[in-house]
From Swiss-Prot:
Pfam families: BCDHK_Adom3, HATPase_c
Protein name per Swiss-Prot or TrEMBL: Probable [pyruvate dehydrogenase (acetyl-transferring)] kinase, mitochondrial
Protein family according to the UniProt entry: Belongs to the PDK/BCKDK protein kinase family.
Reactions that this protein is recorded to catalyse: L-seryl-[pyruvate dehydrogenase E1 alpha subunit] + ATP = O-phospho-L-seryl-[pyruvate dehydrogenase E1 alpha subunit] + ADP + H(+)
Keywords noted in UniProt: ATP-binding, Kinase, Mitochondrion, Nucleotide-binding, Transferase, Transit peptide
GO cellular component term, pick one: mitochondrion
Cell compartments where the protein resides: Mitochondrion matrix
Main localization of the protein described in the UniProt heading: mitochondrion
Reported phenotype of the disruption mutant: RNAi-mediated knockdown increases lifespan.
Length: 401
């Protein structure tokens, strides 16, 4: 069964019926411990049986929300491209809806997952281009911007979760090699936090040196309050932690160099890592001049960036200038019930704080669920002011049950 792919946004016909069906189900939130345990003792057939349904549920939940975006955004070429990618992937996975779990079917499924992963490799950049096209064509009103911000947080954390399922399955039960023999899929049961911090710092420093011809140094302090004197390790997805640290180091270095100048002695970036009974806490402190509270609120907005817009000829690093670095990093932190936030002192510097669950059984996926509440948040019009002045938000933390 194949559906027509004529600019499917909003999705129509038989595809819409399947979306309606699968969006009635809530996604199954897994813990890192569950991922780890299944990777060690699960079978390819059981993983296939779970994934062929769960991927359709997660896709359907977010695709239904996609149809509620402002019509002007859905008409942008890049947005249409993304909607078509999702429709095509949903169709591809529907082919396995009623199939058995024979080794031949599992092998075909693995091949299809690889195709889907490659198809969605540039979803973030392409969706960002859609927003740029919208701004350049007609602008965005405040009500639409709030709805878009709400959707994109959910859309990207949904994408993180889907890629986690796919990569974990393909590494454990497919032909994709793990990063190291110790890894269970994408998960490191004993992730060396200090090593990830240094890798992220050195790579960010390389970019800073190449662009500014100088860079600040780092002072790192580690404190293990659980096993005193021992190195800090946790069960984690190292690539997620690296993504967050690399982004925060880039921001701290850029702010430090631009505030103090390339000819001055640059103050160190100070990093504190503490492992407690419940949390792994990381704080990155720079003396890059900080930002005002007005700007601080906007740093998580997908339609705002402190950098110039990226060139469209591919000469700049992906995401540079899109304004996606911080909001995406926050989603990586929140994905397993952690968090990321900034505290800034204008005229001095900024502290960036990351919290991750130190206990893997408590690190549950935070997943968007298509519901009456999500429909209302995506479609509500301008709100009548009930304060004399704008009241700053409290970090826009996701609701927890």
């Amino acid at each position: 069964m194949r559906f027509s792919r004529k600019l499917l946004g909003p999705f129509v016909g038989s595809l819409a019926k399947k979306l309606d069906y699968y969006s009635q189900f809530q996604p199954s939130s897994l813990t890192i411990q569950q991922y780890l345990d299944f990777g060690r003792i699960g079978t390819s057939a059981n993983s296939y049986t779970f994934l062929k349904n769960e991927l359709l549920v997660r896709l359907a939940n977010i695709m239904q929300e996609f149809t509620l975006l402002p019509p002007k955004l859905l008409q942008m070429p890049s947005s249409k491209m993304v909607s078509n990618w999702y429709a095509e992937s949903f169709e591809d996975l529907l082919l396995f809806e009623a199939s058995d779990s024979s080794p031949e079917q599992v092998a075909r499924f693995n091949d299809q997952l690889t195709v889907v992963l490659k198809r969605h490799a540039h979803v973030v950049e392409t969706m960002a281009e859609g927003l740029i096209e919208l701004r350049e064509s007609d602008g965005v009103d405040i009500a639409s911007e709030k709805g878009i911000q709400y959707f994109l947080d959910r859309f990207y954390i949904n994408r993180i979760s889907i890629r986690m399922l796919q990569n974990q399955h393909l590494v454990v039960f497919g032909n994709v090699l793990p990063e190291s023999p110790r890894h269970v899929g994408c998960i490191d049961p004993a992730c060396d936090v200090e090593s990830v911090v240094y890798d992220a710092f050195e790579n960010a420093r390389f970019l800073c040196d190449r662009y500014y011809l100088t860079s600040p140094s780092m002072k790192l302090e580690m404190h293990n309050a659980v096993e005193k004197g021992k190195p800090i390790s946790i069960v984690a997805v190292p690539s997620h932690l690296y993504h967050m640290m690399f982004e925060l180091f880039k921001n701290a270095m850029r702010a430090t160099v631009e505030y103090h100048g390339v000819d001055d002695d640059l103050p160190d970036i100070k990093v504190y890592v503490v492992k407690g009974q419940e949390d792994l806490s990381i704080k990155i402190c720079d003396r890059g001049g900080g930002v005002s509270r007005t700007i601080l609120e906007r740093l998580y907005n997908y339609m705002y960036s402190t950098a110039p817009p990226p060139p469209r000829d591919g000469t700049q690093a992906p995401l540079a200038g899109y304004g996606y670095g911080l909001p995406l990093s926050r989603l990586y932190a929140r994905y397993f019930l952690g968090d990321l936030f900034l505290v800034s002192m204008e005229g001095h510097g900024t502290d960036a704080c990351i919290y991750l669950k130190a206990v893997p059984v408590e690190a549950s996926e935070v997943l968007p669920i298509y519901s009456t509440s999500s429909r209302r948040n995506l479609t509500m019009g301008p709100q009548v002011a009930d304060w004399s002045h704008h009241v700053p938000g409290q970090g826009n933390r996701p609701a927890q049950s």
